[in-house]
């Protein structure tokens, strides 16, 4: 796997099964990920793909990702297969992961990690100056959205 670039975690006051249901439900992705407008595909079976219509601060496009690892109530790992927004050109071997840990009957730790290698020198500079920070902010928002849905 590529280098870890961003890591965030949260404690959610909900059973691990509820949190798992949220992160594997295709119908909730637009409520979880702030850039997703619409999504098709599957998020609950290893090897399946999802295609997301995205709006990244006014730049619209699509991203197709493959679920390359799925461990029930433990872990999901997504890899970008192709996109129209340029991420695949900027990042080598991007992976986006969720890891869950049961802390109690009604308490779950969720970790969101982004792995990738900058594709060239310019992207390496951008990564240090802004991309890693922005990735971390997006992860924080995603975890907050999951927490809000799970704790309702």
Feature map (PLM): residue ranges:
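Hydrophobic pocket/interface hotspot
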Residues: 18-23, 29, 50, 67, ...
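Generic structural detector for well-ordered beta-strands
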Residues: 9-13, 53, 66, 99
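Residue-level marker for the onset of beta-strands and adjacent loop->beta junctions
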Residues: 6, 37, 48-50, 63-64, ...
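Beta-strand elements of well-folded, non-transmembrane domains
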Residues: 14, 56-58, 84, 116-120
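Hydrophobic-ligand binding "helix-grip"
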Residues: 31, 58-109
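A conserved amphipathic terminal alpha-helix motif
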Residues: 111, 116-152
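Hydrophobic ligand-binding cavity/cleft-lining segments
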Residues: 1-45
